Amino acid sequence: MTIGIVGRKTGMTRVFTDDGVSIPVTVIEVEPNRVTQVKTADTDGYSAVQITVGERRASRVTKSEAGHFAKANVEAGRSVWELRNNSQEAFEVGASLTVEAFSAGQFIDVTGTSKGKGYAGTVKRWNFGMQDATHGNSRSHRVPGSTGQCQSPGRVFKNKKMTGHMGAERVTVQNLEIVRVDAERNLLLVKGAIPGAPGGDVIVRPAVKARTNA
């Protein structure tokens, strides 16, 4: 059992069961996660574990970051992540978290950054219905239409669905099943799709709303 781990989405493939059933899976590469700081309720007001992954050139590490990594006696990673620790499990600075913390058949939640789609209209962004293709409609086929009333209330309500930037948001997909754990190659094979493009960092946690295969 673990509080979570940081990996990198590498792409999708499929695996076959003994019965010949094809299962689409996402491959997550998980380099050893190095613990850089352990936060406790006494010192920080809450319990959490700060980790780093990968490596970064020394010229790209700020002095404050270099001091932080040196204090933990770990190599500077490409970034730092923080995972809340609500369990009784104890972690030590400098320790490594690997894929062996998970097991096949376990359900997980995966958090990542969705693909950016740029500036999008309401039809694409919010699945609005289109207006008439003909019958007097010449240039308003994909226009959202009215955004509110007139004098009362005389404004557009907050959170009105309109055109704007689509994607590039933090997204969490819940209750994905781990099909296989490859400890030799540091890989997790997860059933289904996860957020983001290949090469993006993702956070893998035990499922909050865990379910069983029964």
Swiss-Prot record:
Sequence similarity: Belongs to the universal ribosomal protein uL3 family.
GO terms classed as biological process: translation
Gene designation per UniProt: rplC
Organism lineage: Bacteria, Pseudomonadati, Pseudomonadota, Gammaproteobacteria, Cellvibrionales
Annotated organism of origin: Cellvibrio japonicus (strain Ueda107) (Pseudomonas fluorescens subsp. cellulosa)
UniProt function note: One of the primary rRNA binding proteins, it binds directly near the 3'-end of the 23S rRNA, where it nucleates assembly of the 50S subunit.
Coiled-coil residue spans: none
UniProt region (Disordered), positions on chain: 133-155
Protein's name according to its UniProt entry: Large ribosomal subunit protein uL3
UniProt cross-references to PROSITE patterns, sorted A to Z: RIBOSOMAL_L3 (PS00474)
Keyword terms: Methylation, Ribonucleoprotein, Ribosomal protein, RNA-binding, rRNA-binding
